[in-house]
Amino acid sequence: MGSIDEWRIKIDDVDRKLVDLLNERARYADEIGKIKEQLGLDAYSPRREHEVLENVLGSNKGPLSDAALRRLFERIIDESRKLEREAMIERKKLTSQK
């Protein structure tokens, strides 16, 4: 069964991996934001967000419920969109200063 401390060490390891993966995802979202900006597209893409949620829920094998994963990924998507918009604003500022 293992001790609480052993299980917490495993959770800490998973948390570090999640942070790495979330930051990797954020870098990809930033690159997509650059492309969207070049194409004149908004950071908000409801169709794509729906696809992401469907992909996530389709791969869920538990024990987290679909509702729990939906809430988590809605937040992840929201933060990615915020990052895209902030980066777009920052790039526009840099462009206008030239």
Locations of the language-model features?
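Domain-level signature for soluble enzymes in the chorismate/prephenate branch of the shikimate pathway
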Residues: M1-K98
